Amino acid sequence: MAESTAHTSPSLNDKEREVDQGILSDESGPAEEVKETPDQERSVQGVRWLLICIAVFSANLLYGLDNTIVADIQGAVAGTFEEYAQLGWLGVGFTLGSVVFILPLGKAYAIFDTKWLFIGCLTMFAAGSALCGGAPNMDAIIVGRVWAGAGGAGMYLGNLNLITILTTPKEQPVYVGLVGLIYGVGCILGPIIGGAFADSSATWRWGFYINLIIFGIMAPIYVFLLPSLPRPAGEGRSFINRLRELDWVGTVLSAGMHVSFILFIVFGGVMWPWTDGRNIALYVVAAVTLIAFALSQYFCVLTDKENRLFPGEFLRNPTMIALYVLMACGGAALFVAVYYIPLYFQFVHGDSGIMSAVRLLPFICFYVATILLCGWLMPKTGYYVLWYLLSGIFMVIGSATMYTVKYDTKVANIYGYSILLGLGMATTQAAYAVGPSLVTPDRVAESIQFMNIGQGQSQLLGLAIASAIFQSETLSGLNALLAGKGYSQGDIQGAIAGARSTLLTELPADLKTKALDVIVHSIDDVYVMAIAAGALYVIASCFLPWRRF
């Protein structure tokens, strides 16, 4: 975290306790602005700073891309390996790796040299991408996705920490906003780039190999131009002692909780029935590890309050809780749109990967425009609660209109609906700027991590639940429709993988129309989750304080 200047606050006992905990109460208003002296400037300037920014932000762009790049190549990947039952893991695996590792890596950045930890995470990401690109089977690509996701989480946190350390307090809001914007742009460009590779002679494998090329180009900047940034909390202690400070009990329980719950969601209704004993066992394990994790954090088992994995002290601040919920709702709605708008066009219009991704452009353009407009106007107009309320209302309207889409809905109408949903994304990255204004300067990085946890967990759970809804409903619907028609379970699972399946093209016209009805109805049901996220977004916005940003 950046070296903070003196921070003052009223001497009321309640407020002093909040400051001691790194939190300011809602009544005290936002953290006072850190005044920047005229001689306070960045330690890195000029061309060197420009190159560092390009290299660091390129890593953030790659992280965003890899979150969603499989949205338009999953059909090609599943077709290559003829493994359709594990299709959901292509998207979920990356996000799972990110969520499991984001908490321990966040703590590691507080005690290890930021530069070398960042480079280590980049190397993990590149290694995982290499495994995905060269994967001989579906299991290998799933392992690669989880591995790359773990490294990607470290890349994202590294971006936030590097920006916080290397910029002045006055510059930080702008650069932190850029981190969120570039990540978001990467997420929505992922399907376009993935689709382009999947439809080209390069094949889907280059959707992963491209990461290695960019990493190779930027590596000299990371190694030779990025300054070494040892953390004060880790000074004077050996590598082993710093490792011991990490909350290993919390890390193991967090991993077990997330993995078992995602297995429960992804496998249920697809690999085996929801009531299967294996699925019930996974649910029980997830519940037990969740309770154990909460207890380990509350009682600081084999750790202390300073080093425990989850920053639980932020749960005492209602505004921070509301921002956490808002980040979660926004992340879930974003991933539903990015994954399922192209999927609709692949099925209904027979679009190629690149063409179906191009159909996202109305959503993309308004997403980017509203994020930029919000970042520029929100500090000028003040009361950020109004921006959040408007964003939530448009999220509900956009999701609700997407829910009404049928296989014969006009394309122009769908573009209009996606624009409404894009307008609802205006404040989905704003918490990265609002959150730090609510805490003392020495807790800024932790507040950003807190928001990132909400975003990452929602994307993981949202994507897993959406995949489970789509696959289970489509599978059961097509099984009922095509029963006795001579199609195997593998043929039907292949159809669910996307437009590359020949089953839909071979069906008689009337049967194809009914099959598309089943598929589109399943996609519509996925948007119910986005509607719920938007409704909760509006409710959570009402708990934000009516004060100026």
Swiss-Prot record:
GO terms classed as biological process: patulin biosynthetic process
Record's bilayer topology term: Multi-pass membrane protein
Top-level lineage group: Eukaryota
Signal sequence residues: none
A cellular component annotation (GO) from this entry: vacuolar membrane
A Pfam family it matches: MFS_1
Parts forming coiled coils: none
Compositionally biased region (Polar residues): 1-12
Region (Disordered): 1-40
Key words, A-Z: Cell membrane, Membrane, Transmembrane, Transmembrane helix, Transport, Vacuole
Family statement drawn from the similarity comment of this UniProt entry: Belongs to the major facilitator superfamily. TCR/Tet family.
Function: Efflux pump; part of the gene cluster that mediates the biosynthesis of patulin, an acetate-derived tetraketide mycotoxin produced by several fungal species that shows antimicrobial properties against several bacteria. May be involved in the secretion of E-ascladiol to be converted to patulin by the secreted patulin synthase patE.
Protein known as: Efflux pump patC
Primary gene name: patC
